[in-house]
From Swiss-Prot:
UniProt keyword annotations, A-Z: Cytoplasm, Isopeptide bond, tRNA processing, Ubl conjugation pathway
Species lineage: Eukaryota, Metazoa, Ecdysozoa, Arthropoda, Hexapoda
Source species, domain of life: Eukaryota
CDD domains: Ubl_Urm1
Self-association state and partner proteins as the record states: Interacts with cer.
Name of the protein: Ubiquitin-related modifier 1 homolog
Sequence similarity: Belongs to the URM1 family.
Length: 99
């Protein structure tokens, strides 16, 4: 099987935790089943560059990070169990802002 191509996007400050890059195209190992849970672990190991505690809490995103998959709230799609499909767009939006 070919690589699984997905797009990651970061907005509203979430990009600051990922080297200030707002959009990434990823090619993941297509022989593996990729869920959001697996993706978050991969992101932590490979591209999360600043203060992981502001993005992750345990095995999931921390409260205050909205996750949209193809413009749909991940809560409607099974959250961590959602199985990524080719050309999925996964958007992380931070609602955590200093005052």
């Amino acid at each position: 099987m070919d690589d699984l191509k997905i797009i990651l996007e970061f907005s509203a400050g979430a990009e600051l935790l990922f080297g200030n890059i707002k959009r990434r195209q990823l090619f993941l190992d297509g022989h593996k089943k990729w869920t959001i849970a697996n993706l978050l672990k991969w992101m932590h190991a490979n591209i999360l560059t600043e203060r992981p505690e502001l993005f992750l809490q345990g095995d999931t995103v921390r409260p205050g990070i909205l996750v949209l998959i193809n413009d749909t709230d991940w809560e409607l799609l099974g959250e961590l169990d959602y199985e990524l499909q080719a050309n999925d767009n996964v958007l992380f939006i931070s609602t955590l802002h200093g005052g």
